[in-house]
């Protein structure tokens, strides 16, 4: 019985040997020349910071510039019996214009949202909102990178 379980584990582990991560920087076929954001837009500035590693690439076949505009919305979607807000939803909408030097410009829109419960401690609630915002920004950056890798 132990030999059969060991054999199953070995077979399953050996079948996973072809794993290759999607977001490796080795297979990047684009170079970000310039990223324009509004100075007052914190979300766009965070996205710009996360994309900096793609602007330091050696000369690639596809050189692009980006214009990023982002909006964050937080609104109540449910109330408790007293009429106080109990559930919130945070939505981050990012409009990105991809300016390709070789081809036409392309506009893409990414929208991510997350629902969360209200907390009695307002400081913890604000920290939680910041964490959620960073997670949503990470998802948007991930989608943008996949979009840029597939666009030629």
Give the location of each predicted region.
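Bacterial signal peptide processing site
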Residues: 17-20
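Sec-dependent signal peptide recognition
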Residues: 1-10
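Short extracytoplasmic
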Residues: 39-53
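Surface-exposed short loop/turn segments
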Residues: 49-54, 58-63, 67-134, 138, ...
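C-terminal motif of bacterial Sec signal peptides marking the signal peptidase cleavage site
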Residues: 12-15
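Cys/His-rich zinc-coordinating "finger/knuckle" motifs
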Residues: 23
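Post-signal peptide N-terminal segment of mature Sec-exported envelope proteins
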Residues: 26-43
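Amphipathic, coiled-coil-like alpha-helical scaffolding segments used for oligomerization/assembly
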Residues: 147-152
């Amino acid at each position: 019985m132990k030999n059969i379980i060991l054999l199953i584990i070995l077979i399953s582990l050996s079948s996973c040997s072809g794993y290759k991560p999607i977001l490796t920087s080795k297979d990047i076929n684009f170079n970000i020349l310039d990223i324009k954001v509004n100075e007052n837009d914190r979300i766009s500035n965070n996205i710009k910071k996360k994309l900096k590693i793609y602007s330091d690439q050696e000369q690639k076949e596809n050189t692009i510039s980006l214009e990023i505009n982002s909006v964050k919305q937080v609104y109540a979607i449910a109330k408790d019996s007293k009429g106080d807000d109990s559930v919130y939803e945070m939505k981050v909408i990012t409009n990105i214009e991809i300016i390709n030097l070789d081809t036409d410009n392309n506009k893409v829109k990414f929208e991510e949202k997350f629902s969360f419960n209200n907390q009695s401690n307002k400081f913890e609630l604000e920290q939680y909102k910041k964490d959620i915002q960073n997670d949503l920004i990470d998802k948007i950056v991930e989608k943008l990178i996949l979009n840029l890798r597939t666009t030629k």
